[in-house]
């Protein structure tokens, strides 16, 4: 048995280059101890993106220089898997406000998109900003929370203490859903999969039609 490759995975949504630099040092130690010449070194992914305003954007310039040095020193091919970093901020989920419900200390904006369409907020308590499609200068009275229609306590998206005035039938967009959006979606609660539209410059094309109930039940 001959080992030709080594693969590492150190985490996800990493916003500092330091863990990646440490990984290279660990790999060097492994190569020195085992004296194995790996033809392929898969450094994985994990490169984070800025979901929140205060998220630090990762700087990979110094890391890339170390990778180039590592590649030359050990004469190997380098593989990366930067999925989120490529597609994370390339997509939005456009959804409609179905109802407004007044709570004791906040207003609920119930959307027609739920955790079945976008799971990250329910699964990881992830933060995804919601942007009004049409902006106005009016302010909502008190806190506003965007939630979904699924009968689960985790079917919620984000709460704002200050937000513009929202009305029933308004459209809003959930941001940065390109990674782990469609791939984590499901038919939970007998909900059809939503349509997907790709926009290239001024042209839009449907790449997945909205699923109908008949095809859902015939699965």
Explain the meaning of each model-derived region:
Residues 66, 75-219:
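Charged (often Lys/Glu-rich) extended helix/loop segments that serve as interaction or gating elements
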Residues 1-100, 189:
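Active-site loop/helix belt of alpha/beta enzymes
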